[in-house]
Regions:
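Acidic, Mg2+-coordinating active-site environments of NTP-dependent enzymes
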Residues: 2-5, 32, 115-260, 285, ...
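Short acidic-hydrophobic, aromatic-tinged amphipathic segments that line or gate anion-handling sites
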Residues: 8-12, 338-347
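Phosphate-binding loop of NTP-binding sites
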Residues: 9, 15-154, 160-169, 226, ...
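ATP-dependent carboxylate/acyl-activation modules
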Residues: 37, 247-249, 368-374
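Short SAM/SAH-binding signature in class I
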Residues: 89, 113, 221, 356-364
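Active-site beta-alpha connecting loops in nucleotide-dependent enzymes
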Residues: 246-248, 265-337
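Peripheral docking tails and interdomain loops at the edges
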Residues: 340, 360-379
């Protein structure tokens, strides 16, 4: 053993890492405002939007944010250990796939503001039902400081349930409906996008450059966090206008063939697939969907993949190419225009034969399916 180094012995390295990061985070109580971000979809995007807003208010050196999606019981402690005295804000993304995980993470972070982006069906195979997912996501409330703020979607199925779980501070809601405290309108006329955000008597006009209706809702969530932290309207506007999206999330690329690739390969669950399909459906020209398996669905796997096929057909998608064991169910449900492939090469060759310079190709699947390899191949053609 190298006796010139310091060693810490522990019976549980993960718990040991959590203990050290919790101790380190406590040194910054009353010095840094902490934001915790969780939800079934949009965690990383909302985290990046919030960070952009905070950097517009202060400077990048004063804001610590989770890198990428390091949001588990290793990533969160590693992020907390990067806290430094120059930081004013910390934006910590927290994920989970089983009960108790968020309780563990949020008690380390102790957020002043916690945002639950939405509650969908991600990890339903582990948690058994959407109600179970709601209970697991509500665990983030356990770590909220007294007098903190819980930010939730006003129109979400579990808004009332989540509000009832937090009685030590306030709740701030966001959404499109009139009952949302932070309300937004998306204008996609005249070939461009703009957002109006309403909060009390305040109106903020934002030029918007990010694809997808769901990202409009993500922007409202980020703005609500900004209001909860008393960030200036100027910084909220500038931060959202500077945000240009996250790699692998509805990222559009014009191919040399003239066709448009929609790279949404970062990950996939039922809700995010449906939102991506809705975006594909409003694009001009031929609509091609390359779909890889969705993971962690357990006993719901067959039914949810079938539903993707049905939904794609109902939206007028032209072709569905499935890749993976369960994607075959989507192809069968899609019917005419659906093909299943066991070989990446065969799928790519078939896809290339369908390109005509006017198609939109959406590629999506869970991370383990490596659907990004299809995108890389098309871009390199």
């Amino acid at each position: 053993m190298d006796c010139s180094r310091t060693f810490i012995f522990t019976n549980d390295t993960r718990q040991g890492l959590n203990n050290i990061s919790t101790w380190w985070r406590k040194k910054f109580t009353d010095k840094i405002k902490f934001v915790g971000v969780t939800g079934s979809n949009g965690k990383t995007t909302v985290k990046e939007m919030i960070a952009s807003i905070l950097c517009a208010e202060m400077s990048q050196s004063k804001v610590l944010a989770t890198k990428g999606n390091l949001n588990n019981d290793i990533g969160v402690p590693k992020t907390l250990l990067n806290l430094r005295r120059e930081h004013v804000f910390a934006v910590i993304e927290m994920g989970m796939n089983h009960y108790g995980e968020l309780t563990h993470l949020t008690n380390a972070v102790r957020p002043d503001v916690a945002v639950i982006t939405n509650i969908g069906t991600a990890h339903i195979g582990e948690l058994g039902s959407q109600d179970g997912i709601a209970r697991a996501k509500a665990e983030v409330i356990a770590g909220l400081v007294k007098g903190g703020t819980l930010v939730i979607e006003a129109d979400g199925k579990y808004a009332e349930y989540l509000t009832g779980q937090y009685d030590l501070g306030s709740t701030l809601t966001f959404g499109e409906s009139s009952n949302a405290e932070v309300r937004g309108e998306l204008d996609q006329s005249l070939g461009k996008q703009a957002i109006k955000i309403f909060y009390g008597d305040l109106v903020i006009d934002i030029d918007w450059f990010v694809n997808g209706k769901h990202n409009f809702l993500n922007a409202l969530a980020a703005a609500a966090v900004g209001f909860a932290l008393n960030i200036s309207p100027r910084a909220i506007k500038r931060g959202l206008e500077l945000f240009k999206g996250v790699d692998g999330r509805l990222e559009t690329v014009r191919l040399r063939s003239g066709d448009t690739l929609i790279d949404d390969t970062y990950n996939a669950n039922m809700d995010s697939v449906c939102r991506a399909l809705e975006y594909l459906a409003v694009q001009p020209g031929r609509k091609i969907f390359v779909f890889g398996d969705m993971g962690e669905l357990g006993e719901f796997s067959n039914a949810m993949h079938e539903e993707v096929g049905r939904f794609a057909k109902s939206l007028g998608v032209s072709l569905l190419y499935g890749f993976g064991t369960f994607a075959k169910q989507a192809v069968l449900r899609f019917g005419s225009g659906g093909l299943h492939f066991d070989s990446r090469t065969d799928l790519l060759n078939q896809l290339r034969s369908e390109l005509n310079g006017q198609a939109h190709i959406l590629i999506k699947g869970s991370r383990f399916m490596q659907m990004n390899l299809f995108c890389e191949a098309l871009i390199s053609d």
